Amino acid sequence: MKEARRVTQEFKDFHKGAITIGASYVPATYLLPEVVHQFQCEFPNIKITLLVKTAPEIRMMLQNHEIDLGIISAAPLDEPLLKQTNIMPDTLVLAFSKEHHFSKKDNVSLQNIEKERILLHRNPSTTRDLLTQWTLAHNITFQSEIELDSLETMKQILKYGNGIAFISKLAIEQEIQRNELCYIPIPEFEFQRNIYTIHHEDRWNSKIISFLLQSITSFTTKN
């Protein structure tokens, strides 16, 4: 009933109201700023709330009707109540400082990686889930781990040459351009991760949501 009332109000006046977006870190940081700017120009009277959470948290919030739209980096998912659209790949890579000895190696093996200090995302996160699947598939046990809640902190630690990290390539593009970090493909990593827009199946696709989705699609196409 609450959802129906909100839909009715949006239909009456799509130039007023509010929209709540949940986004995981990578799309929130590297995709949404320009999209939100375009949205505010088109709908200046719409209040936007952006919540940065992990992908599992965003899925739960959508199921509970706590947010209108989710934008997440995730592996392909199959949840009947949630409708998803794949908008772009979000490739995980193995990142390290240009001073790290991996930057001088022609080939990095699984055994080489196993001996390094690994910077890990906290649970729950899609990155951590995929990394766990990869380590189990190849019987890898890290000898030294540092668990972090912040991707920015992880990147700063990497710059000092202190360890390696499995990280989104999108998240380190600026550091790569500035020659602060290097990366290689993760050896024998066969898992797929993309950025998806995701919404509850009973959430009406209003003019506001439609414009937002078009802005996201336009951004990913030109980039």
Go through each PLM region and give its residues.
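Central regulatory/effector-binding core of bacterial HTH transcription factors
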Residues: 16-78, 148
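Hydrophobic hinge/microswitch elements
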Residues: 54-67, 73, 126-183
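Short helix-loop hinge/linker segments at domain boundaries
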Residues: 1-20, 29, 37-45, 79-85, ...
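Secondary-structure junction motif
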Residues: 102-103, 117-138, 205-213, 223
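Short loop->beta-strand "edge-of-pocket" segments that line small-molecule binding or catalytic clefts
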Residues: 22, 92, 108-127, 220
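Acidic, Gly/Pro-rich loop/turn segments at junctions of secondary structure
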Residues: 42, 53-116, 190
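A late-sequence structural motif
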Residues: 31, 182-223
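Ligand-binding cleft/hinge of the Venus flytrap
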Residues: 35-44, 111, 128-141
